[in-house]
Amino acid sequence: MCVCGIDEAGRGPVIGPMVMAMVCADDINFYVNDSKLLTRNKRSLIFNDVSGLYHKYYIINPAEIDDAVKKHSLNNLEEQYAEKLILKAECEKIYIDCFDVNESRLERILKDRTGKEVICRHHADRDIKIVSAASIIAKVLRDNEIEKLKSIYGDFGSGYPSDPKTLRFLEHSIINHDNIDNIVRKEWKTYKNLVQGHI
């Protein structure tokens, strides 16, 4: 039976885009797993198989993420992009790695908007193969985007607030008034605190 899976990569970083991806297939006859549980090399190998399936994705830049956080919420932005992906789905049944604390609420919203059978589950990227496949697409594409940014701006680490290398990069950029507007999420508390500390 044809099913689709949707997942995102890069929800939490203070630097770089978020990627939402969807994969649709009748069956997945090769190994997949939650992208977070795989090494980079293993993800890349599986990506070659997964990318041969029907898939769609969106790369969402930091400015759009900031705008959503200011006006509504990050969840609201993900709802919008999940809806766009579902409307492009080749199948009637779509599994989503739930980004809302309330699974049934998100299911209801997306069912009402799309008319599709939407099933939202926490840890779906780990438990449902088609969502694992989507998580690999999203993660590898985001990793590729991060490498492109590093080739322009230098090595800023993982981009996550918990990464000391990322924090050093941000602090150095703020002190030196470097133009990193295109890559940083200014609405993140991490960035705001660093800016405040150097006013």
Curated annotation (Swiss-Prot):
Location within or outside the cell: Cytoplasm
Pfam family, one: RNase_HII
Cofactor: Mn(2+); Mg(2+)
UniProt xrefs under InterPro entries: RNase_H2_suA, RNase_HII/HIII, RNase_HII/HIII_dom, RNase_HII_arc, RNase_HII_hlx-loop-hlx_cap_dom, RNaseH-like_sf, RNaseH_sf
Domain RNase H type-2: 1-199
Domain of life: Archaea
Keyword Iron appears in the UniProt entry: no
EC number from the UniProt entry: 3.1.26.4
Keywords of this entry: Cytoplasm, Endonuclease, Hydrolase, Manganese, Metal-binding, Nuclease
Positions with a binding annotation for a divalent metal cation: 7-8, 97
Coiled coil: none
Catalytic activity of the protein: Endonucleolytic cleavage to 5'-phosphomonoester
Function: Endonuclease that specifically degrades the RNA of RNA-DNA hybrids.
NCBIfam families per record: ribonuclease HII (TIGR00729)
UniProt family annotation: Belongs to the RNase HII family.
Name of the protein described by the UniProt record: Ribonuclease HII
Organism in which the protein naturally occurs: Picrophilus torridus (strain ATCC 700027 / DSM 9790 / JCM 10055 / NBRC 100828 / KAW 2/3)
Gene: rnhB
